[in-house]
C-alpha cells in the first residue's frame, strides 16, 4: 500500500535525485527532462487530488509546488549552464470538467502559475501534457487536444520560457499550424516553440523526412539512403 513520505524519505529522495543527475551528465546526455506528470511522484505532490499532506509539502499551492522547486533547483545546480533543462507537466488533471467529481484538482490555471514561478528557476522548456492521476479524469481527445493548455501557458510566460505541446499531432501541416498559430488545426492564434512527437515515430521512423516533404522543406539525408529516392545529391538531373 502507498504511504505518505516522511521528511527523511524526501531528504533521501533529493540525495538520490542529485546522484541520478550527475550520472546523466557523466554519461553524456544532451538534455535533462524532469518528469512532473502522469501520476508520477512530483505530479502527486502538485495535485490536491493526491496530496493530502498537512506539513510544509501539502495544503496550499505554495506548499504543494515546494518539492518540484527543490528538485528543479538541485538539478539546475548540477548541470552546466549550457545544458538545457526541460520539465514535463500534466497541465490539468481533467477533473474540473467532470461534474461527477466534487473535489479539488490541478488545473490549467495552476499550471500557468507554476510556469510563471519556474521562469526564475532555470527551466528552459515546459513540455505540456495532461492527466494521469485519477480514474475519474474526463479527457476530451482529438487532434492536438492538449495544445490549448500549452498555449495558455505560453501566453503567460512569453519569451521567458520555451513551451512545447504533445498529443495527437499526426502531420507536418498540423504541427506547423500549431507552432505558427495559423491555419487549420492551429488551436488558437498563440504561437508555440515546439511540438513533441513520440508515437508517430513508432509508425514511421522516417517521420522528419516525411513531414519535411509534406511542408516542402529541404533536409539533409544520408547519401546511401537518398540514392534510392531520386539519385545521389548533386548529380545532374536528366
Predicted regions and their residues:
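Flavin-dependent oxidoreductase catalytic cores
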Residues: 1-238
